Amino acid sequence: MSDLEKIRLKRLAKLQQTNSEANSSKEPKESNIAPEPKKPDLKKRFIGSKATTSNSEQKEISPPVTSGAPKHRLFSKDEWMHFITCQALNITLSETDSSKYYLEGFKKDLEEEGSPLLFNENNVDSALLSRLSTTGNNTFSYLLQSWSFLYQYKKRLPKDENQDFKIHYLSLLKSLLVSYAGIVVMLPDTFNSETIDLAEVLIGAEGIPLEFLSEFVQRFEHENLDELFIPVLESLSLKIGLMNVDTVQMNVMQIILQLVSLKPIALLLPKLPSWNPTNNAGEIEYKTFLGRISSLSVFTQDVASRYFSNSTERSAQNISSSISSLKLTMSTYQDVLFQIFNTLIRTSTSLRESVLDFFAMVVNANHKRQSIQVNHFDITSDACMLNFSHVLSRLSEPFLDIGCSKIDRVQVEYFRRNPRVDIKEETKLNADQKASESFYSKPAEGSNNFISDIFFLNLAFHHYGVNATFKALEQLVQSIRDSEKLKERLETEQQNMSGSFQATRLTAQLSRLDQRLDLDRSFVHCYEIMLTQTSDTSRSFSFLNFVAIWLSRLADGQSSTYPKMPLSLPFNENAPEAFKCLPEYFIETITDYMLSLFKTSSSTLTLHSLEPLCEFCVSFLTQANYIKNPYLRAKLAEILYFGVQTHVGRSELLLDVVRTSKVATRWLLPALMAFYIEIESTGQSTQFYDKFNIRFYICEVFRTIWKQPAYFGKLEQEQKTNLPFFVKFVALMLNDATYLLDEALLKLTEIHNLQSLLADAISNSNSNQNVQESQSNLAAAERQASTYCQLGNETIFMLKLFTSSIPKAFCAVEIVDRLAAMLNYNLQALCGPKCSNLKVEDPTKYHFNAKTLLSIIFDVYLNLCNEPAFVEAVAHDGRSYSKEIFERATSIMTKHNLKSSFDIEAIKEFVNRVEAFRLQEATEEEDMGDIPDYFLDPLMFTIMKDPVVLPRSGISIDRSTIKAHLLSDATDPFNRTPLTLDDVTPNDTLREEINTFLKSKRNKHSRNSE
């Protein structure tokens, strides 16, 4: 028989005796029923109590002296026990003491037994039973307040020779009160008490002292504790799950924290029906205990509307104040949430494993969060995932010290030892599914440690939680832009349909659109609250910086001690299998998060060292053997771009590192050039257009570092070290400039024509359909023109920089003709007879400035004008070169003071040399007479100087021509089969024949001249 049952039977027997006595005696007077004991003034140890007492308000609690006792008389032990029992239990054996409850029946029992009329350790149990028979529905409250009095009295007990005795008796009384409190809660019918909802008592105004709860749990640890507290934990978690940041009762979270701080209660959690009942991602925050308490959110329509509705009309101060207030609430909540998880993890090994299993279940069930389109009912919410990420980032902090002293505790073999994080279906860095499965099918010895679990779980939550939320924000912002454009179009249509039925319909549609726009804009601020909390962004940066160092260390080899010692670059050509088989998101999580910080100019970036991030970008930018996906490595270039740019209110965050880092100053320039070449072909259908965006970032980084002393002379060094590599780079840059400027000028001409067409249509009142079609075409042309102009400007500026540094490199036979043709063509477009077609309304809208572009093109001419090969190349361009165009261009330059008189004279001298060479060539060509067709290059139609035979087509072509072709296209130009320069063979016979022909013509010319 359990203790509870014994006490229950004892109580029933006592009640029977009491009832029989009551039948033969009169009812006690109402005046004898004392009021409930006054609640002691406790400090802050009540779970759920909303009241706090300042130090100035605290008063020492001392037991009041009964009216019959002398004020200064010392108590004997028996008297003291009687006194303290009366005070604590609010009972008395004196009929005249109206301040306490008179135990008349109990007094008679003592008299019949001949016992002293004093409460003591032998009879206090019975006395308490007698008192409890009268408390009714207030039984639990009575027991709790009595215990609280004893707790406070014991804390202030003065030291004397009877201290141990007093402590023993006080503990006995407290133990009795706790035991009977358990009976009241578990067996309320024993005292005719109402059923106690312990959860409601905990969150009530008075709450329950933590020490009482601790003793309660200790007393009943082995007696149905789960039946009592499992419903409490479930109830409290459900309450949190129904709250948002505007309605949250933080005391409920505090209660849960206090409960789980008691080990027996914490160990009950895995027994909860809601502990881990589902692996459905959409149900986690509703059906699981940890999901419910982690679901507090600002992402509700109520919160968004209350704080941020009509945001365009609110003051910036008002919005900022709301954001700060909600951030504070979320910060307070997340702090308690972390304490709960931290407590659980430290409670026991088994509970820690259960919590880690839960985290793993959540992240493995949420892979769809990174999908382009997803049903939000199939995934866990942004708020819940961000709260989980917050907890894991806090758990990661102990191993994120500045010196990375614990980095070797992150186990490379983690995914070969029954990992919690599922990466089976993830795209790997440089391994296909078969290779990956083969690698991971070979288990590693040992077991995974806690640091590794937290490391890989946190990384996965940053990918599927934090970064997926940033992506959701980007989609929301894009949706707002689309809605704003739609609104503009509908408003235009409404004006054109004024007074018609369609206008009324459009009015209703616009009203709905305004409501949606207002809500969407409000939610943007909600995202700002969750994603820009400085403490969170700082933790995430530190963690992902640590991940970048860990990856660099892994690539550097087993003997690497990075970051204590520098990286050994370039990395080994053969990447470790452990690296190649890691998921792509290990890199992507770093790049995407860092880009989010750079794009928003987060203040977090100023709080940390950026050197590891810079070195990470430089080290892996060209490492295709380590990171196969070029688009993933392109994000490294994008980080460098945003890092060296000037941001609003903040200087170039990465520039200092780029200037001083030994890794950057040695490897950045060649890495940018190599990646510029590599991105020419990505294997994707969109590669032709993708490369321009990526190269824009590269050009901007070039442009920035060009001015830095640490990079002076680096370009010349690269050209001397590997000339073929450099020529390939220059050729691709030239291709880009040719295409982009050509497309930009074509689109500007199209815009010019469409703007003229629209002006005529409006003045002639043409049909709305024609106007709308023209407006649509104009909008498309404007978008394209803006892109082409911006990209073209950067590329031509790069040509200006590079030609100023190493002009001879641009006069290589493979590229000089194309460079001259490109410059001449654009000069003609800007200054020729059709230049008026480039006049558009607000050209700055498209990043187009004709004078600036003309000046840059002239700079390239000036940089190369003293190179004979360039003079010849310009003279050979019979399609675009014109002396008159140069004269018109110099006139424009002079008129607008775009160039100095010295530069103008240099250009005129250059044109004179070109004209002289053209005259000389014309004379020589006339002397040549008829030239056999097979002496002519099949592509350039000039006499071949060094003919070679293409292996598969068998066609002879000049070596310089095929070299130029192969710089941008590694195929035979006549049958598109793969081709390299090593495949061609010299056509010595044809070369000798051509040389003989030329010699004979020269001899004939000499004789005629004589």
Curated annotation (Swiss-Prot):
Keywords: Cytoplasm, Nucleus, Transferase, Ubl conjugation pathway
Domain U-box: start-end pairs: 930-1004
Recorded GO CC terms: cytoplasm; nucleus; ubiquitin ligase complex
Signal peptide per UniProt: none
Primary enzyme class: transferase
Gene Ontology molecular function terms on file: ubiquitin-ubiquitin ligase activity
Compartments it resides in: Cytoplasm; Nucleus
Coiled coil location: none
Pathway: Protein modification; protein ubiquitination
Primary subcellular site in the record, as a coarse category: cytoplasm
GO biological-process terms attached to the record: ERAD pathway; protein polyubiquitination; ubiquitin-dependent protein catabolic process
Listed Basic and acidic residues bias regions: 24-44
Record region (Disordered): 13-70
Family annotation (CDD domains): RING-Ubox_UBE4A
InterPro entries: Ub_conjug_fac_E4_core, UBE4, Ubox_domain, Znf_RING/FYVE/PHD
SUPFAM superfamilies: RING/U-box (SSF57850)
EC number: 2.3.2.-
Keyword Cytoplasm: yes
Domain comment in the entry: The U-box domain is required for the ubiquitin protein ligase activity.
Function: E4 ubiquitin chain-elongation enzyme specifically involved in polyubiquitin chain assembly. Binds to cdc48 and elongates mono- and diubiquitinated ERAD substrates presented by the ufd1-npl4-cdc48 (UNC) AAA ATPase complex to a chain length of 4 to 6 ubiquitin moieties. Delivers these polyubiquitinated substrates to downstream ERAD components, which target them to the proteasome. Enhances ubiquitination at 'Lys-48', but not at 'Lys-29' of the Ub moiety.
Sequence similarity: Belongs to the ubiquitin conjugation factor E4 family.
This protein's name: Ubiquitin conjugation factor E4
Organism for this UniProt entry: Schizosaccharomyces pombe (strain 972 / ATCC 24843) (Fission yeast)
